[in-house]
Swiss-Prot record:
UniProt-listed PANTHER family: CTP SYNTHASE (PTHR11550), CTP SYNTHASE-RELATED (PTHR11550:SF0)
Record-linked HAMAP family: PyrG (MF_01227)
Region called Amidoligase domain, residue ranges: 1-272
Residues annotated for ATP binding in this entry: 19-24, 76
Activity regulation info: Allosterically activated by GTP, when glutamine is the substrate; GTP has no effect on the reaction when ammonia is the substrate. The allosteric effector GTP functions by stabilizing the protein conformation that binds the tetrahedral intermediate(s) formed during glutamine hydrolysis. Inhibited by the product CTP, via allosteric rather than competitive inhibition.
Encoding gene per record: pyrG
GO biological process, one term: pyrimidine nucleobase biosynthetic process
Binding-site residues, CTP: 18, 153-155, 193-198, 229
Record's protein name: CTP synthase
Amino acid sequence: MARPKNVKHIFVTGGVVSSLGKGILSASLGLLLKSRGLRVAIQKYDPYINVDPGTMSPYQHGEVYVTDDGAETDLDLGHYERFLDEATSQQSNLTMGRVYKSVIDKERQGEYLGGTVQVVPHVIDEIKERMGELAKNSNLDILITEIGGTIGDIESLPFLEAMRQLKLDFGPKNMLNIHLTLVPYIKAACELKTKPTQHSVKMLLETGIQPDILVCRSEKPLSREIKNKVGHFCNLHELDVIGLSDCDTIYGVPLMLLNEKLDIRVLKKLGLKKYKEPDLAYWKEFCNKVQHPTDGEVTIAICGKYTEYPDAYKSILESLVHAGADNNVRVHVRLIRAEDAEENGSDVKTALEGVHGVLVAPGFGDRGIEGKIRFVQYARENNIPFLGICLGMQCASIEFARNVCGLSEANSTEFSKRCRQPVIDLMEHQKKVKEKGGTMRLGSYPCILKEGTKAHQAYDKFLINERHRHRYEFNNEYRRLFEDNGMVFSGTSPNGELVEIVEISNHRWFVAVQFHPEYKSRVHCVHPLFSGFVAAAKEFAHGARQLSFEPEAPSFQVMPGAEN
């Protein structure tokens, strides 16, 4: 395989245990190299057989991150975008399922000329071809590829073999491997143990790959003695053993790696000599705001269906960190399980005690819906800043229909197929869709904002583009009734047909959106809705003068025929 001219490749692998932070390492290295004036992109290769994570349970996979071009991808792509301030795409995430599907499709079309299709060479060649696509189609200096999984997993072997072959094809000056491992601290012995790292490197060597740089995660900083020992047993110079001890925030990782001179070692090994000194002044200022806010703290309640597994809301959590720094406050997040308000008769007032903002999170299915609706109602009636996202917007619409518009049977056809008052309904083009994978309304779409609304005030422009992931929408048959009762439709599709944003004008801050603003919040560009939401929570927390506000009493202006 020919290497795209001048593109250097870095492969990041992980060993010992999963969830060590390969994505954060890749994003941090990318940031350091970009700050030196290099053009960098990052891609993620996942070893599972699913074509994409779109149909996977949030409990198993965490958040599904959606790109501008509508790809449903791994949550690590969110880290790449937040750190590098560069958009990713479908090309940025490859699964083994997509590789096998492509190989099988080619076999069915006769492209292998009757040959026996095997992992070697056909699957490996497919992987190698895909590994170079992003480099071919982009103006890059460096392409970082994160290999998912842990060394020793059988699923990762084809990716590792492709990586081994590429190093032979490209040459050592054009490709290197960074291996992330764990150096556990044993409290009983008061000692860092290097044996797991040694065994992980041994397993990597069995695949024919000698790591060029080791990054060692640990609770405590690595001494020079430990680095020397690890290097001695893993065939590396001690300068190529990088320590990465625990940080208070993931945004401190690039600064720690800068101090460890990881970027300098990478540049030297790749033969890159012309580069500028990194300028991370903004990043340092951001980290200082995150760790040492000057205006106190706020508590935001996230009401969701998957709160037992916070990675399901990874981009939302990080967006709140960004918004907190933007408002000079520390954001404490209280994760609230939506079903608790249904199953245990939970007191919503008690659950939200001390909360300065309520966020009803995205999700699918009817589990926990009535609980979410109760939390929406409490936030609306008690003038607590509120943000609803995707399903959260739909729950806000249902709550408003029931408790303000007098539509007691209002619901979504997602939860009740024969709903008599469907304020949320399946989109017309979705009604004939049978397959689940990759068939939702996905990716970036334009939205027109209404002047004088909170949404327009936050964005400070009339045309925006946001990323979507949904099948259901607000039923336009009810728009007039909602408007008559005080709901403002502050954002719609350019043709005015699809409701994107709803808000209540006489509420402190009540905004709900059909799209996913969390996918576009970055360190360098905090999302305006999250910033506005946290600003309202900050004002609420600091006891600012409350707006003159009374909850809307049910007006019972029923649509003609709605009582039937």
